[in-house]
Amino acid sequence: GETEKTLVDSRKKILDYTDEVRVIKCDPHQNPMVRSRFLKTMMREYIEGDFLYVDGDTLWVNPINKEDFSADVMGVPDGHVEFEKFIYHDYHLSLAKKLDFKTPSKFFINGGVLFLRDTPVVHEFMKSWNEHWNISCEKGCYTDQQSLNHVNYLNNNIIKLMPHSYNVQIVFTIRYLLNAKLIHYFGTGLYENEDELCFELQKKSFWSHVKENANIMSLFEDIVTKPYKCFSTSSIKLNYKSEIELKNPIYGFINTLAKSSKVHAKVLLKIFNMGARLSVALFSLLSKK
């Protein structure tokens, strides 16, 4: 595979810490993101026995309990909430409409951690996932969660819920962090400004250091044994209401101006600040009448 070709020099050391490596041939013309989704939706065909799949942007915190896996297919809701209350509800709804897919009535399952049994039912489910992911790709959507949740709908919600502690999505909540089995820190779509990130493994500078440092285990020793130390000292988790407010386009525009080093952006920001002060004063005056 294409990934195997990159495992040279210092990067090859990671193979010393694996029990088994399987090389799957993929289309070399596809980008890494598409290849990873292809493998993800096909993985049931390449692995024997029941297994727990986890995304690469995750960090183990505590041992698993096999008794927690009681159904053929299991996952955790995206955002740890019902779909109706999910901050990206409207986004997923519009994307599903574009793809002509169905959306769940209760939970939109996050594809980052999935338990999959080795049964005929699960093999059929995974085959259908791959087929619908290909349909999604043909329509320009290469991510896998839309097809996953559509196939879950077609199979009468076959995906049952595992304990939330197996997929603690720290960008959404810290509710399950204390008893976390696995932290899902979301390494994709990183911010340009690393000061906005609350977790060390979300930062591009961290992974650049990993690539340059051949002694991988010494670099990760502290992280594996003390994962909570990866949080920034100034980490703040907003409540749902605040997150919705921050999705407002006005805030987004002002935030863009504040980050820009351009002269015109600084001028516009000053004008906005002056306008905001005048608006607050006028609002207070009118409210007293």
Region roles according to the model:
Residues 1-289:
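Glycosyltransferase catalytic domains, chiefly GT-A lineage
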